[in-house]
A protein has these predicted regions:
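Long, contiguous binding/interaction regions
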Residues: 1-298
């Protein structure tokens, strides 16, 4: 069986098109890898790149990408709404076909070691690859961001898994690990008051007692002068998109605010969108496996 791994690096650059293209070209030029998608956000000052391929080829592409990002992105000059700790901030690997989660964890460790050696960036292993429970959650690792990371890594519980107690002077550190597919889902609000988005994010995220498998923060989109609830959904089968959207809509109404649009960043499983169609259309006795045309022509 063909072995396929997906990789979704996030880089801390969403404004300089030449830099973004230079980083993406490292993926394009790697044999046995397919570039699927990349998108950028100027307010976040961040880009999400998605590619997949044979496991070793994906590792090669990710290492090349990390090296180029470290060469071209200087976090001492970086500003943006999204939290960040590295020029390449996070490199997740997702098992797609013919490879187990356990094998992908081992692959992520090889990737982390190579990124450390070849790009000179200290590496934290996170999610299913985490070396300790406190490193499972990316937000916990990233707390303090680039500006506080040099001090943070001196603590015993926050020493990087690869690279020693230091950070790259301009590229920071990076999180590398195996995770399951997630949905990056942003909800835009009819207000320029970011505190409203932050309050809603706190209510809906799991860490504050909200919805299961939901991570969220409130940010300001300066270019549009609106606030946004930025969400990562780590298991849409347990908490579907429509439930998150309706929860946010309900909470926003308390502040006299409306949902004015949503965004999906990068690729998302078809099932997540079909679930929404089934819910909002109130389709009775729906069977996506048998009633969605594309399922017969894969």
């Amino acid at each position: 069986m063909e072995r396929i791994v997906e990789c979704v690096p996030n880089i801390s650059e969403g404004r300089r098109k030449d830099v973004i293209e230079a980083v993406v070209n490292e993926v394009r030029s790697t044999p046995n890898v397919m570039l699927l998608d990349y998108s950028s956000d100027e307010s976040h000052n961040r880009s999400v790149i998605t590619f997949m391929g044979e496991p070793e080829a994906v590792v090669d592409a990710a290492v090349k990408l990390a090296k180029k990002a470290a060469e071209l992105i200087d976090l001492t000059k970086h500003t943006g709404e999204h939290p960040r700790m590295g020029a390449v901030d996070v490199i997740p690997l997702i098992p797609i076909r013919g490879i187990t989660k356990e094998e992908t964890v081992e692959l992520s460790k090889k990737l982390g070691e190579r990124v450390c050696i070849e790009a000179d960036i200290p590496v934290f292993l996170y999610e299913d690859s985490a070396s300790a429970p406190n490193r499972t959650n990316l937000a916990a690792i990233r707390k303090g961001q680039f500006e506080g990371m040099a001090e943070k890594v001196q603590q015993d519980e926050w020493a990087p898994d690869f690279g020693g107690r230091r950070i790259h002077p301009t590229a920071g550190v990076v999180a590398v690990g195996c995770r399951m597919p997630l949905v990056a889902f942003n909800i835009n609000l009819s207000t320029s008051d970011v505190s409203v988005a932050s309050k809603i994010a706190k209510i809906i995220r799991r860490s504050s007692g909200g919805l299961d498998c939901v991570k969220a923060l409130g940010i300001m989109l300066e270019d549009r002068n609106i606030a946004q609830v930025s969400i990562n959904m780590t298991d849409f089968s347990r908490t579907p998109l429509y439930r998150v959207l309706e929860f946010v809509r309900f909470e926003a109404a308390r502040y006299g605010v409306q949902v004015i649009g949503t965004e999906i960043i990068g690729l998302t499983p078809m099932r997540a969108l079909v679930d929404c169609a089934e819910y909002y259309l109130q389709i009775e006795n729906f069977n996506a496996d048998k009633q969605v045309l594309e399922n017969y022509i894969q």
